[in-house]
Amino acid sequence: MRDEATRKKRSFSDGHFFKKLKLMSRKKQPVMERSKTTRTRKESTNSAAKSSLSLRRANNGRKTIAKRRVLTDIGSTNEGVAGNSGSNSPAQYSHTPHFSDSIPPLPLELPDIVSIRSSRSHISNKSNKNKHGIDLTFIPRRSLQNSKAGLKKPNTSPQGYFNIPVTIDRASEKVKHTDTKNTFNSSSSENERPVLSILQKDDSQSSSHPAIDSMSAPNNINNNNDIENSSNSLFDTILSIAHSAISHVPKISALNTEIQREFSHSGESHTGSTRHPYFHIHHAQQQHPLSQQQGPLPVSENANQNPNDTVLIHSPSANTAHRSSSFLRHLDYLLSPTSGPASDKHTQVEEGDDEEELSPLSKAFLSPSTQLVPTNTSTTPLSGSLTPNNRNVNANSNSETENDNDRDDRSNVGKVKFQPLKVHEPAISTFGKGNLTLEAVAGSSDIDNTTIDLDENNTNNNPNASSTNLSHISKSNVNNNLGPKELNTSYRNSTYIDMARFENSQSNLSSHRARSKTLPANKALENAVGDEGNSKRNSRYSSYSNDMAFDDADERKFRSMSKKFLNRRSFSPSNLGNKVIPGINLRNSFNKNRNSSSDFFSTNQGQQMPRTSTAGSGNIHAIMGLDSGNDDFKLEGIEYASEKKNSEFHTLFKDCDINPNEKLIVDHSCALSRDILLQGRMYISDAHIGFFSNILGWVSTVFIPFKEIVQIEKKTTAGIFPNGIVIDTLHTKYIFASFMSRDATFDLITDVWNQIILGKKYRNGFGNNDDGTISDSSSAFFDDSDDNDDDGDLDDDDPDINSTDMTSSDDIDADVFNESNDLGKNQKSTNYLLGPNKHSPTTADFKPSNNDHLVIEANINAPLGKVVNLLYGEDVSYYERILKAQKNFEISPIPNNFLTKKIRDYAYTKPLSGSIGPSKTKCLITDTLEHYDLEDYVKVLSITKNPDVPSGNIFSVKTVFLFSWDKNNSTKLTVYNSVDWTGKSWIKSMIEKGTFDGVADTTKIMISEIKKILSDEDSNINSKHQASNNESEEEIINLPTIGPPVHDPTEPDFQKGKDDTVIDEKINIPVPLGTVFSLLYGDDTSYIKKIIENQNNFNVCDIPKFVNNAREITYTKKLNNSFGPKQTKCIVTETIEHMDLNSFFMVKQIVRSPDVPYGSSFSVHTRFFYSWGDHNTTNMKVVTNVVWTGKSMLKGTIEKGSIDGQRSSTKQLVDDLKKIISNASSTKKKSRRRGKTVNKRKSSPSTIKNEKNEENFEDTSTKNSFFSAFSMLQQVNITSVQGIMTIISFFICLIFFFRLLFHSKNTSNIQIITPGTILINGNEYNYVPNFKTLYHVYEDNIIKDARRKDSNKNNIVTDTEGLIWDWLIDRGNGTVQNSVLSNHIKESNNKKVKLVNGVSDHKIQQLVESIKITELQLQEMKELLAQTDNTSATNQLL
């Protein structure tokens, strides 16, 4: 115990000052004395020598290599293994122990770590022996050699007990020795590497000196080992290797005859009874992972001089295991003491081919490629030579001690020194500091490629190895007989190693290691042997086994998958954010490709599979259907972004292997939380979530597949701002913050995620119960989310129920329906009318609270039951019509069982008109039926949540609808509204005001729509009856048609895009769907050509027929813009994208106008949706969008003009269609049939009124021949829009007629007595005469006089003009009057003769006045000229 404590306290560096002084003093002693002294001290303690490791570093710049020395104790028997003593005289080589046939040296498994402490100080003679008599003196600790290569080779010996659970694959189990010869052709491979030397340990009571074990020659010469005991220190080891390399000349020794004969046969292994039962030599080719990159090592010149100087390196055998990055980062686990020995029954032998050996000088500078490499293959005895290309290594055994009797005859102890021939940059430069990662050496040139190629002609089913053909193993020549086997093995780098603990006894070891084989799920276990002889029965297949074959080009990307792997979590800094999967059993060994843009799990075959959730024991049950190859998958209820945004999205993430067909849904501004907040934008597509940030050239990109997401949750930033979203994958957590509308983004991501993961199950209400709630089994997917939205309840309506089935009467025969007209009315009314038709006024039992505001009180002229069932009945089409009238869109399915379940949930998107804030918001509605009595009142509570508005998650809007009876059997509607707050907000008053105003507006729209629906019911019933009566006539309309003539109403599959503009969605064409298709897109193109010409177009080309559902039309369109060209050429491409005459058809039209400004940078995309409407008509919806491919300064103007032009063209299209239909209908003799129909419906008040109007029209037409065409009213359908317009026009014409007829009787008697005096209807008025007044008063008379034939007759206007001149003469200045005129007038007055031609007299008066005025002006001009200075010049000019 004292020695044991001393060993535990001993420093690995062992560089203390006193130790050095002691060593210096001991150097003065002879080597033999020191050896004897050491042996005496070791024998007195009655313990075996302990193995140790020492380290020295050779620092050459950055290439620092840890040079290792392994000091082991090797016992010997009477015919033991000869080892060199490393003494100064050649005589020391005279005594060489022989290999004993009975008790061979036991191989020792050495770790490849630079520092190891043994948990035991010494081993006693009895307590340290297992049941087989093997003394366990040294329990090495399994570790990693470097970051490039771990424990790779299959192991034939049991493993030690260690403190870290690691799964280790064993290539074979304990094998009993037989006389069967196994020939291994180790020279058949072209990629052979230098095989490491084998270290054998001789643990003798007489000598515990470490010695370099050498090959025994046939003459069995024993060489005494006089190497000094280095006391297991680093400094002693350095001195020892220097002493051995410089002072001694290698000598040749040989093995016994039997071994030499084995070597001469190149790999034939003979096992006989003369050998010790515990002597087992392993056969393998030790190849270091770095040897392929470094090439063959140089051979020492003294290689053939002394084979006894061959360093025998004990290589620990290990299974093909992998190491994890966390294992490398925490080497403190590996540096802890080992515990618990393990033993094995048998080992195997390794043989080599070459006969050269390296001298100690060469071995002192071995490269890292010759260092200790774990193996897992059996070996045969070494040959007399060892070359860098083929080094034979003794297999490892965890039993390091032998019997006491064996120790007495063993006097040699081998010391093994590890030194590189060349100095290379270390793979692990910070070994032992806890921060080692595999990524540091991922790109190293030293990575080797592993291949295990089985000879196709010589592949055997050996009971020692069960062949698992997983990759490239030949399947053609597999023999069940034992025979030669050629194996070429090279090992690749592991990415993970897992070490398992073993028990002391062999029985416990077997039970502990007997586990089921873990193989890939997609490969069957081939040629498996299940008996006790199966050497792989006690192994777990991690990533590889020795029977697998892999390509050299394969990269390191696998790790073992033990049961404890997923229970352990790495706490290294790079893995702190990684998600830990629950401890479940997976059948596949998988590894995450870090360099891949999308994370996949790779199976052993190098194939990639998407992750699947697993459950159970050893079986995989896929919870989510991750069929990535389903290209037909399409998201439902999702509005995609514009093509321009989608193009930008593909450009930003072009390096992320994005699918060209992937569509962008929306992008939001947010920030990615890392060391700092990286402000950027989140792009949500139908397959990925992308984030792109570019801050001053620092680009950050994140691309997350939806199929890799395991959890989405909301997060509060800084504890107070609810604007964050956390997205978890299996390996990383992403935190996004600074969302403007966090809840809306969260709902969208969750919706897309659920549809992608659950697929059709989600869309069909996966896991929903009858009440629309999510069941317990399916709610497990959403337990981690704190979103309380009841989106799953939106799909609880039965998809098989058609709302029109209850009201459709298309299957009823027309004649039967006409005969039972009243019965049909009763059947129709029962669909929406429940309760009594008449009732006295009632009052609702409701007392509003202080927060309730009265929104409106209105009266609806309909019974209570009719109004309530119209809003909340089974036919939800009325309510959808009301919501659309309120300008809502993206309306979710509305449950039709509200009156029975008394609760319903639905959602829609409402546009907002606020100057600030969002332009739209999602509304989540929950209606609750609190009271339902159609003879009293009905109360409905509606709760609305608006998550997209500011502070939308802390308030809800409650609206109470009260329906009660009112006067005249009508319905009284009272609406109260309130806002409930669950938190505080700075904009509370603004939200409340906007809420009250919004509810008031929507309620008014609802009431008006209810009245319209009720008023249209009678007309709809009559039109339906008429359609049934005239069905036979409509079938023979002279118009082309295809498809069924009768069908129930349908809805098109329309998803409004972000930049789409709805031109019109309420267009109805009174013909079946097939007729509209034939008119617009059928073979007869004359109709569409005429329509195009009527749309202000000319130079229309010949309209072609559709070829492959596409055609192209060109024409020239007139433009009426104030600037720009006055016409442009239009190139129209029409494509039928969906064709189903039983549902709907959609035609996409792309118009290009190259002649307009920026015409090459945009195109107008218009989609026409045609579906079945009510009464076998066709509904038409037109949606347009301007798609830009370049930039323009006139973008707004062009878009506005394009949309306006499309709107006018659509209107013209509909008008022309209706004209074509009406003209085709008028060619039929429908007047008599329709007249009979009108005569039959005498009970209708409107019909009686129409008949009276017709009688009046006929009486009026007899009085005036102009109205003889009044009989055409019989051909007019009064209930149609055209009939109503005809009647209105008729009444307007009638009013004008009566006005013209009786207008002449109302004229007034006007007479002018004297100038200034007028007589109107006997009343005399004074006025100032002027021409303006005169013509205004006598305008009618002037017009009449102009139309008269006797234009010479005097009228009142000309007569009055003369009187005016007389009035001017009488009151004028007499001096000014012209004598001629005056005499003329006096002469006229004296003669008192009335002038015949008054007009001539007035002209003379005008002429006289004009001459007078001219003379006055000339006189003034003369006076001005006379006043000038230049009088002479003026006179000359005159």
Curated annotation (Swiss-Prot):
For bias kind Low complexity, which ranges apply?
A: 45-58, 286-298, 374-398, 455-470
Q: Which residues form the GRAM domain?
A: 648-716
> Where is the sequence biased in composition, kind Polar residues?
74-97, 471-485, 818-832
Name a single GO biological process: sterol transport
Q: According to the UniProt record, where is the region Disordered?
A: 1-97, 174-194, 200-219, 285-308, 338-418, 455-485, 505-543, 777-843, 1225-1257
Q: What is the effect of changing residue 1205 to A/T?
A: Reduces the ability to bind sterol
Query: Per UniProt, what is one GO molecular function of this protein?
Result: sterol binding
Attached carbohydrates are found at 1306, 1373, 1430
Q: What is this protein called?
A: Membrane-anchored lipid-binding protein YSP2
Biased region (Acidic residues) positions are 783-800
Q: Enumerate the Lumenal topological stretches.
A: 1299-1438
**Cellular compartment(s):** Mitochondrion membrane; Endoplasmic reticulum membrane
Segments in the Cytoplasmic topological domain: 1-1277
Q: Which SMART domains match?
A: GRAM
Q: Quote the biased-composition stretches of kind Basic and acidic residues, using this chain's numbering.
A: 1-17, 30-44
Q: What is known of its domains?
A: The VASt domains bind sterols.
Q: Which family, according to the similarity comment?
A: Belongs to the YSP2 family.
Grouped into one coarse class, the protein's main location is mitochondrion
Modified sites of kind Phosphoserine: 13, 411, 596, 1032
State where composition is biased (Basic residues).
Answer: 18-29, 1227-1243
Keywords annotated in UniProt:
Apoptosis, Endoplasmic reticulum, Glycoprotein, Membrane, Mitochondrion, Phosphoprotein, Transmembrane, Transmembrane helix
